[in-house]
């Protein structure tokens, strides 16, 4: 999760000072700097013809999503620079979260994500061709 919160969409949401360093990035990719200081994770998504974009964002006690698009598939952006989740949906989510954090009664977490006590997945690289029923059982044993 640290990779997403530090370097992925979360890093982009928290980054401030863009106005001094990269005007194009600030105005075209993020819309404006959000300057969140807390841990945030998220994932953007885009349809192949740039008619839909979405962003799913999360903090430790809240997951929310924003979808931008239309039912008529012929309506779409001609260019991926504007027709993607990062430029269509992410700015809406950022504004929503900024406003949500202004209301302490909502109790939205600004803490770090809890670290799991133990995450362990055994790998047997020498026996990659094991039968699929064994693979399925292994995944079920892990809770998947």
Model feature map: region roles:
Residues 1-128, 142:
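A penicillin-recognizing enzyme superfamily signal
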Residues 135-144:
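Extended acidic low-complexity intrinsically disordered regions
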Residues 130-133:
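Secreted/processed peptides and extracellular or luminal domains of membrane proteins
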């Amino acid at each position: 999760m640290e990779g997403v919160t530090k370097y992925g969409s979360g890093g982009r949401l928290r980054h401030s000072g863009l106005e001094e360093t990269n005007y194009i990035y600030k105005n075209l990719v993020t819309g404006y700097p959000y300057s969140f200081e807390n841990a945030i994770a998220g994932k953007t998504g885009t349809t192949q013809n740039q008619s839909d974009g979405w962003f799913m964002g999360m903090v430790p006690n809240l997951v929310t999503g924003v979808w931008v698009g239309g039912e008529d598939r012929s309506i779409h952006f001609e260019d991926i620079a504007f027709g993607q989740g990062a430029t269509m949906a992410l700015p809406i989510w950022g504004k929503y979260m900024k406003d949500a954090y202004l209301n302490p009664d909502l109790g939205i977490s600004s803490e770090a994500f809890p670290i799991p006590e133990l995450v362990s997945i055994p790998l047997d690289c020498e026996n990659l061709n094991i039968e699929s029923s064994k693979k399925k059982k292994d995944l079920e044993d892990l809770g998947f």
